[in-house]
Curated annotation (Swiss-Prot):
GO molecular function, one term: RNA binding
Record-linked InterPro entries: Rib_uL2_dom2, Ribosomal_eL14, Ribosomal_eL14_arc, Translation_prot_SH3-like_sf
GO biological process: ribosomal large subunit biogenesis; translation
Keywords: Ribonucleoprotein, Ribosomal protein
CC per GO annotation: cytosolic large ribosomal subunit
Signal peptide: none
SS bonds (residue pairs): none
Family note: Belongs to the eukaryotic ribosomal protein eL14 family.
Domain of life, per lineage: Archaea
Protein known as: Large ribosomal subunit protein eL14
HAMAP family in UniProt: Ribosomal_eL14
Keyword Ribosomal protein: yes
């Protein structure tokens, strides 16, 4: 089971959207993936993200590579994961 794969639900750990959940829609290369919230569910808009800024979860939805936000939203509703996606995660930064 690869951690970074299309359909994997992840938590963003860096940036302005830190603590928000997103879905991997496409794998661009070894370092970057395309993610979406979708924006109306989690507030994460569709964008390219470094994989070091993501923490994969154990949850995955069955979507095609490059799926639209509407397709992702429909699959989340079918899987009863909409409320799970809306939950924010508190990110704690290590202190020195």
């Amino acid at each position: 089971m690869p951690a970074i794969e299309v359909g994997r639900i992840c938590v963003k750990v860096k940036g302005r959207e830190a603590g928000s959940k997103c879905v991997i829609v496409d794998i661009i290369d070894d370092n970057f993936v395309l993610v979406t919230g979708p924006k109306d569910i989690t507030g994460v808009k569709r964008r390219r993200v470094n994989i070091l800024h993501l923490e994969p979860t154990d949850k995955k939805i069955d979507i095609q590579k490059g799926a639209s936000d509407e397709e992702v939203k429909k699959k989340l509703e079918e899987s009863n994961l909409t409320e799970y996606m809306k939950e924010k995660i508190k990110i704690r930064m290590p202190t020195l």
